[in-house]
Amino acid sequence: MENTENVRSGRNQREYSKERQQEGGYKEVSKAAVRKEGDVKQDMGPSVSMTVVGEKVEFTQHFHF
């Protein structure tokens, strides 16, 4: 019984996040990602930024010397 509930709630979460992306909810995430990327630059130098393109996730590395 518990297993089916967990699976169902997981599916609902996935559908919810897809809806959020279509509504432009990802803009909030990208703002936070930019802020985090800035923090990483100050701490370590090289930083990794994440771009979500549809279903795919792309990682780009930036090196600052």
Swiss-Prot record:
GO BP terms: transport of virus in host, cell to cell
Identification of the protein by name: Probable movement protein p8
Transmembrane domains' residue ranges: none
InterPro entries for the chain: DUF5428 (IPR035284)
Protein family: Belongs to the carmovirus/necrovirus/panicovirus movement protein p8 family.
Organism: Tobacco necrosis virus (strain D)
Keyword annotations: Transport, Viral movement protein
Entry function: Cell-to-cell movement.
Ranges of compositional bias, category Basic and acidic residues: 12-42
